[in-house]
Amino acid sequence: MFLCVPHYTSITFPQLNDGRKVLRFGSYQRRGFRILAMSSSVSEASNYITAAPIFLPDGPWKQIPGGVTAAKGFKAAGLYGGLRAKGEKPDLALVACDVDAISAGAFTTNVVAAAPVVYCKNALDMSKTARAVLINAGQANAATAKRPSNDYQGDAGYQDVIECANALAKLLQMRPEEVLIESTGVIGHRIKKDALLNSLPKLVSSLSSSTEGADSAAVAITTTDLVSKSVAIESEVGGTNIRVGGMAKGSGMIHPNMATMLGVRLCFLHVLFCKVVTTDALVASDVWRKMVQIAVNRSFNQITVDGDTSTNDTVIALASGLSGSTRISSLISHEAIQLQACLDAVMQGLAKSIAWDGEGATCLIEGSSLVNAATIRIWRYRGHMAMPTGPLRIISLHLWYWAINHVELCFAAVYGRDPNWGRIACAAGYAGIPFQPNKLHISLGEILLMEGGQPLPFDRAAASNYLKKAGETHGTVGIHISIGDGAGRGQAWGCDLSYDYVKINAEYTT
């Protein structure tokens, strides 16, 4: 079994001659795996993969260990089942709930959606609850067979998913539609079904509510990730302590464009990623699905690494209701607002970890933007939709996203430690948001580069050093764009674009 180094501690391995702490993120040798995996006799683990740094926003919650198993009623496991093309890192993960959990999902809008994506959407249409999520790494099970029209019943990959779901449901003694399945890996490859089916009994028997169970599952879903991504928080909702936890994978093919089962398009943006979120809060099905919609829009749909929208993007969120909290039946209740904040925090923390771990990246880019009321009036007039999180916020996110996260030139400039703000101004101009050029402000960290549409003299050496320091420590570069002084604010996240990104992806399947 593989274990994650807990991300709420810092562990030193004596095997490292220089005694560096594994969680000193600036010391990573990116993509070389030279210090990220090492042998150990601790427990039954033969290797460790470190956990991503935690990027939780500030709020009335505390971080706790446990990931997807922190919430009451959930167990998890991860093991090697022979699905990976190379190595013996775990490649099968299972998250299960002791009771029927209220379920929600968000999925890629890519037309070539993977078989498990279609299966999960169908399952969520059939049932408001689910009790298990099975995830395999190695094969995406997307674009796996020809089929007439949109009939997935004739898709061999889809039939593989059904067979795996039925087998797992039998072992867990639940209905097949209560089993959800996610896949990640190489597109065009079907699941190694025989290997997966043979591994299910051991996977089920390994289920544990411990932190180790959650960590092993978080490791099992990784592919090109250098770190596992798992987090959990505890907070008070309506006078009762509830927990929200989650795990995610993603490093390349990151450009989410997901919609929920409500059929609402979530974003203006566009990972090959899989995510599972759990909570023990008690919440009505329709409210939970709307909450997940909002949280995904504020988190995973605001990140990008390479502008590539995957066939497999999936978020599954389960609520066991075992915390003893009062049932949340209204989206505008005080308790719902509290739970929404917790859900947002966990998803944002995981989303930022994905951007931080972008393939070949040396730093996280965090952008913020500001728009005014005049802009939103023009936006509405032109017929663009307003989202539940507030139209000013969405337009602000849209501006930031297109101005920074959709432009490889900006990513490359950050990697080159070049404070070339002209690329940012140029991209803002074609973001599709109408504004007066004399209202444009751009800053890099605390360094103001443009104000009122006019370039300002600034210390280029200091700006370059700011970027250099972030790259050397795998820190964060902050970029702010403003086209007004109104209340429309938003954030989004990306990473720099390095030579290593090209190398990693040029050699991905070879």
Swiss-Prot record:
Role according to the record: Catalyzes two activities which are involved in the cyclic version of arginine biosynthesis: the synthesis of acetylglutamate from glutamate and acetyl-CoA, and of ornithine by transacetylation between acetylornithine and glutamate.
UniProt xrefs under CDD domains: OAT
Protein name (record): Arginine biosynthesis bifunctional protein ArgJ, chloroplastic
Single GO term (MF): L-glutamate N-acetyltransferase activity
Binding site for substrate: 223, 249, 359, 505, 510
Similarity section: Belongs to the ArgJ family.
GO terms under biological process: L-arginine biosynthetic process
Pathway(s) annotated for this protein in UniProt: Amino-acid biosynthesis; L-arginine biosynthesis; L-ornithine and N-acetyl-L-glutamate from L-glutamate and N(2)-acetyl-L-ornithine (cyclic): step 1/1; Amino-acid biosynthesis; L-arginine biosynthesis; N(2)-acetyl-L-ornithine from L-glutamate: step 1/4
Pfam families: ArgJ (PF01960)
Miscellaneous comment: This protein may be expected to contain an N-terminal transit peptide but none has been predicted.
GO cellular component, one term: chloroplast
Substrates-to-products reaction catalysed: N(2)-acetyl-L-ornithine + L-glutamate = N-acetyl-L-glutamate + L-ornithine; L-glutamate + acetyl-CoA = N-acetyl-L-glutamate + CoA + H(+)
Species for this entry: Vitis vinifera (Grape)
SUPFAM superfamilies: DmpA/ArgJ-like (SSF56266)
Assembly notes: Heterodimer of an alpha and a beta chain.
